């Protein structure tokens, strides 16, 4: 085999983006690279951080053997790809109808791509949020719904249309979650942008998915970890159904249900906004032409993952996902990223009874999923007894299936004691891309299947190894949003204010969901 002369090295992060279908297998002192276009054998260290050439006859012979073996593997993989069923055929399994049995170990590639895609919906809530305290628009979304995905360069999401932005009142005791401007004249004194509701409208996308997908994406906290200190670790009755023993953490409940009557953006609570919009979309699409089913997918990261679970439970508890015209139960799936515990064991059991499917994607080194519920949680053998017999006020339980990932398995990430890195969403999506299963051989093989750009990891943190030469926290608006006006002065420009949805619009659908408008019966009972 002729010696290789490569213009790129493994130190270049673009190497992986530009080489489709890379498959890495580590042999002693050898890295084997297989692509759809060519197969080659590269000598490198086991850490995949240095490359050297081979001149000995023995190593040349080894190369030939590796090439032959991997050509056979490549052919088998290509044949397997041809046999692979389409997403539209297995979307129910990907959405968790069987609790992802047989899909996580090894990782099903359709599921991998969908986890990443929904994670990007959650990441978009960070990337579009104005957290600049020097801006009068601090706490709002920087983009209009019509060009939201275009501005974020999310071409894979262009088949969706955002139908409603979600807002919450900032007049609750979560100071590290809400962002406020330092200026006196601002877009809203009481509201923060919380996320959006979107629906798949492009017929090609609907056909690819196999159904009409309604997405609810919740924003997490810009401060990453500081918001944890705001949690009171107090359980309160959810009051979304008839069972007062179903309880969720008080801070999450307040964020979801509180409102500010004097504010046009939060005169309806985040709960009322999302329920009204889901009701409207189900009425519009739920009975459409035969052949199209509907799904509801809720996603969020960190505190946003908490809201994702609460809202998914709420929709199911109210039976909002039932379409009586064709007796169809719309499946509800939560893709949760780095989420904390939300409610007690009875809350977890009720989610299971209602058929809410939850896939929790976590980094094992992240501390957020371990709170609240340090004293009593789902790992405690007698939790059910403690809750039923003693009304223990600090008992929490995770809901759903866990996909636990380890950032130490990635050769691209450096060792760090920064807890924010372990909690970072882009880093988590990077781990999803490289994960292949729990067995020993799969854990050794970290291969980026979708070729997700590793530079994204450093978008808002410093986690990549130095040899990739990607600056930390690199994402920001050009000139931090400053522009030169007609007088030659640099200023933060005005932008068109988004008008809130009219109260009549929300009230009409809310009336059908809750039975009355501006319901005052959601005052929590704390324990």
From Swiss-Prot:
InterPro entries named among the record's database cross-references: AB_hydrolase_fold, Fungal_lipase-type
GO cellular component: chloroplast
The protein's role, per its UniProt record: Acylhydrolase that catalyzes the hydrolysis of phosphatidylcholine at the sn-1 position. Moderate activity toward phosphatidylcholine (PC), monogalactosyldiacylglycerol (MGDG), digalactosyldiacylglycerol (DGDG) and triacylglycerol (TAG).
Tissue expression as described in the entry: Highly expressed in flowers. Lower levels in seedlings, leaves and stems.
Gene name of this polypeptide: DALL2
Catalytic reaction(s) noted: 1,2-dihexadecanoyl-sn-glycero-3-phosphocholine + H2O = 2-hexadecanoyl-sn-glycero-3-phosphocholine + hexadecanoate + H(+); a 1,2-diacyl-3-O-(beta-D-galactosyl)-sn-glycerol + H2O = an acyl-3-O-(beta-D-galactosyl)-sn-glycerol + a fatty acid + H(+); a 1,2-diacyl-3-O-[alpha-D-galactosyl-(1->6)-beta-D-galactosyl]-sn-glycerol + H2O = acyl-3-O-[alpha-D-galactosyl-(1->6)-beta-D-galactosyl]-sn-glycerol + a fatty acid + H(+)
Swiss-Prot/TrEMBL GO biological process terms: lipid catabolic process
Location within or outside the cell: Plastid, Chloroplast
Observed phenotype of the null mutant: No visible phenotype under standard growth phenotype.
Chain span(s) of sequence motif GXSXG: 300-304
Annotated PANTHER family: PHOSPHOLIPASE A1-IBETA2, CHLOROPLASTIC, PHOSPHOLIPASE A1-IGAMMA3, CHLOROPLASTIC
Induction and repression of expression: Not induced by wounding. Slightly induced by wounding.
EC number: 3.1.1.-
Name of the featured protein: Phospholipase A1-Igamma3, chloroplastic
Pfam families, per database record: Lipase_3
Gene Ontology terms, MF aspect: galactolipase activity; phospholipase A1 activity; triacylglycerol lipase activity
Chief subcellular location: plastid
Keywords: Chloroplast, Hydrolase, Lipid degradation, Lipid metabolism, Plastid, Transit peptide
Ranges for region Disordered: 55-82
Regions of compositional bias (Low complexity) in chain numbering: 55-65
PROSITE patterns: LIPASE_SER (PS00120)
Compositionally biased tracts (Basic and acidic residues): 66-75
Superkingdom classification of source: Eukaryota
Assigned protein family: Belongs to the AB hydrolase superfamily. Lipase family.
Enzyme class: hydrolase
Record: transit peptide: 1-52
Record: active site: 302, 366, 423
């Amino acid at each position: 085999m002729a010696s290789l002369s490569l213009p790129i090295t493994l130190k270049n992060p673009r190497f992986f983006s530009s080489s489709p279908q890379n498959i890495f297998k580590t042999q002693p002192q050898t890295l084997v690279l297989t692509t759809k276009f060519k197969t080659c054998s590269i000598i490198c260290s086991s850490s995949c951080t240095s490359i050297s050439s081979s001149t000995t006859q023995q190593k040349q012979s080894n190369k030939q053997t590796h090439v032959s073996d991997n050509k056979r593997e490549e052919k088998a993989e290509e044949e397997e790809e041809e046999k692979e069923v389409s997403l539209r055929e297995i979307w129910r399994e990907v959405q968790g109808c069987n609790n992802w049995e047989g899909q996580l170990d090894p990782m099903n590639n359709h599921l991998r791509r969908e986890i990443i895609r929904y994670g990007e919906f959650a990441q978009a809530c960070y990337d579009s949020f104005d957290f600049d305290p020097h801006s009068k628009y601090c706490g709002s979304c920087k983009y209009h719904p019509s060009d939201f995905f275009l501005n974020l360069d999310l071409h894979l999401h262009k088949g969706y249309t955002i139908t409603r932005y979600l807002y919450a009142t900032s007049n609750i005791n979560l100071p590290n979650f809400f962002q406020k401007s330092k200026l006196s004249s601002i877009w809203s004194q009481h509201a923060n942008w919380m996320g959006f509701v979107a629906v798949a409208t492009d017929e090609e996308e609907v056909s690819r998915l196999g159904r009409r997908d309604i997405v609810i994406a919740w924003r997490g906290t810009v401060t990453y970890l500081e918001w944890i200190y705001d949690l009171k670790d107090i359980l309160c009755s959810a009051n979304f159904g008839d069972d007062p023993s179903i309880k969720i953490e008080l801070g999450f409940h307040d964020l979801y249900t509180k409102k500010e009557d004097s504010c046009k953006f939060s005169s309806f609570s985040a709960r009322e906004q999302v329920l009204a919009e889901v009701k409207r979309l189900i009425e519009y699409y739920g009975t459409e032409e035969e052949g199209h089913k509907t799904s509801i997918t809720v996603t969020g990261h960190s505190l946003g993952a908490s809201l994702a679970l609460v809202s998914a439970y709420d929709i199911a508890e109210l039976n909002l996902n039932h379409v009586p015209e064709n007796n169809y139960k719309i499946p509800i799936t939560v893709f949760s990223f780095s989420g904390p515990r939300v409610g007690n064991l009875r809350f977890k059991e009720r989610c299971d009874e209602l058929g809410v499917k939850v896939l929790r994607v976590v980094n094992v080194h992240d501390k957020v999923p371990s709170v609240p519920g340090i004293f009593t949680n789902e790992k405690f053998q007698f939790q059910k007894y403690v809750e039923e017999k003693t009304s223990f006020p600090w008992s929490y339980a995770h809901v759903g299936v866990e996909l636990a990932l380890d950032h130490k398995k990635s050769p691209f990430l450096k060792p760090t004691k920064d807890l924010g890195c372990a909690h970072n969403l882009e880093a988590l999506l990077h781990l999803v891309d490289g994960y292949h299963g729990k067995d020993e051989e799969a854990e050794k093989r970290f291969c980026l299947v979708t070729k997700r750009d590793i530079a994204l990891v450093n978008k808002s943190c410093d986690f990549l190894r130095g040899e990739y030469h990607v600056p930390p926290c690199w994402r920001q608006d050009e000139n931090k949003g400053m522009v030169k006006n007609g007088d030659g002065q640099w200023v933060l420009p005005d932008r068109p204010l988004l008008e809130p949805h009219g109260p009549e619009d929300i009230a009409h659908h809310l009336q059908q969901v809750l039975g009355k408008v501006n319901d005052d019966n959601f005052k929590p009972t704390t324990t």
